[in-house]
Amino acid sequence: MIRTPRSNSYEDYWKEFKDIASSTDGENEEEEITKTPDEGEEEISWLKEAGYDFVVNYITGGRELTDEEIQGFTATLTTSQAAVVRRRVNTLSATIRSKQKHKVDVRDIFPQPPDNQSPRSPVPQTTSDGIDDINLSAVPRRHTDKRLPSLYRGRGEYSMSGRGNEVFKDPEESGIETLSVQQTGTFNKHMVPDPPDDMRRSVMTAMPSISDEDIELCIEETAPKNSMQNAGLEKEDNLPNFNIVPDRLGVTMVTDLSLEDMKQIKSLALIELTALFERHHIIYHRRKGKKKGRDHGIFGVPLHTLIEQDQKIRPNQTVPMVFEDMAKFMEHHCLEQEGILRIPGSASRIKQLRKDLEDKFYSGTFSWVNVLPHDAAALLKQFLRELPHPLLTHEYIEAFAQVENIQDKKQQLLVLNLLILLLPPVNRNTLKMLLELLLKITQKRRTNLMGLSNVSMIMAPNLFLSPSSRSKTKGVREMEISMAAGTSNIVMMLIKYQDILWTVPSVLIQQMRHQNELEMQKKNREKSIMKFLRKDKADVYKKPAVINEGDFEEGVIRVLAPSLTKSCAAVKLTDNTTAGDVVDKFRNTNFTNGRNKKKDNNVQGVANFAEKDARLYEVGGNIGERRLDPATNMLALYQLNPNAEWVIRSESMD
């Protein structure tokens, strides 16, 4: 007779919660006090995380941004994304003005609607008949009137990355055209004024425009299949099945992009997440934890502290070593244990194991040989819930919980995807390792009686109940218990859809490319900024030239493989050439193993060919670095990024 997992009820959740409460000794519990943010503090924090440090510096310095300037640095955003940025800029500007009590502004007496208005000059301008000047916000975004005056005053530092400064002087001299500021990207060094409207339209056409409707995950719902059981998931979860839709430009995973590119993607993800929540009328609070945690040891130590000390031992470590050891032990010895995660281990043994880990782990003398499965599971859960800063972070743990309030399943997945992108790398990597372990546990459900629902309900309180919920503050405890009670579905989605959630939406990559192209154009204009005074400025605004124009016209790419015998080759692309096809040209078709001792007629010694794990990388041009999906259509990508370099690398040789 086939045994099945326990019924889908909240019994497992409440039992786990009681076990958590009873296992907390309270001796070292530190009360977390939620401080009400100072006026304007939330807007400053949000704008900085969204990449607009220069805007914060400009406004807090007592200056004003015109509508044209705001439209300039939000030009690469969708309408809803730009509106989100504008509202926060307007709110911060109004807050700063209100703090300057010695100076009363008419806008503080007659405030403008926040959704479609923006700050103007400190002194309201009127025409001779007393009628207010034209409302700048009525000018369509990306198509501002070049005749409108700019209101730069004094000095302003403009750099999206914060690495460059440019002084803008007041354009008082007659005949000098006033220009706006565009948002910068990762490659920005300096900011320079923008071209006039007609020129701006020409450079904007380098990439297709992006609408609000384009921001979505490329997934499609599929009918239930018997293969679901092979994935470890049954229809008991009541969740639809989704597949990733192939993309001509390749599906991009989080780990495929460089760290610099991910910083840019993170800024875009925050803006889009905020726009989505506002569209669904959902409010969440970005908390800041006050609990510092220990600066050494295992339990109660922040993840960033653990990974910093671990990388001194293993430079390429991406998750805390102790958590990796726990997960690997459970994967090898605990998956088939009945009631794993649900049945508690021995309190006395767990206490001793904790002490042994603290004392022996980093000296290399701790042994997992005699550790029992349920004790190991208890250690892993204790490690997670005792983190002084939650795995899902103080800033976004409430946002994760709020996903349940969105009705559309695809929209839920998009929000979860954006939240994953917003996590710090160590949190995101640790969460992925945890979810992979939990999925493997559900794949053995007929043996361990732990289906997806059971695992999710048990893990929800360990992920969503912060240490403050176990403090003496009853109000805080009841609030977080209420919040966590509805989070088992969120954990279920994280487990089931993890492959989808760790992709980077193609539209965000498109926006990043767009920003970087504008930055390259600004760099070119920087070298000849005095040409702005000439009557004919067409040469200043022309698009960056294709470096190898002959190759581009013929559809030929130059592929570099510095670690292989054939270190460089020209590859002619066809409509069907994929990134995998390009790598195959560097493999030895006579051998299954990439590295072999076959003598080459042209090269003396050992011939190195591409290994099985070799991948093609897109480097430079309008992106930092991206590891390509083998199914990427190379001709389509080449046309999008003609100035990129193409490099083959093997993970085993890095």
Protein language model annotation of sequence segments:
Residues 396-397, 409-486:
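Alpha-helical bundle/repeat cores within regulatory domains of eukaryotic proteins
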Residues 340-347, 370, 393-403, 438, ...:
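Short amphipathic alpha-helical segments embedded in low-complexity Lys/Glu-rich regions
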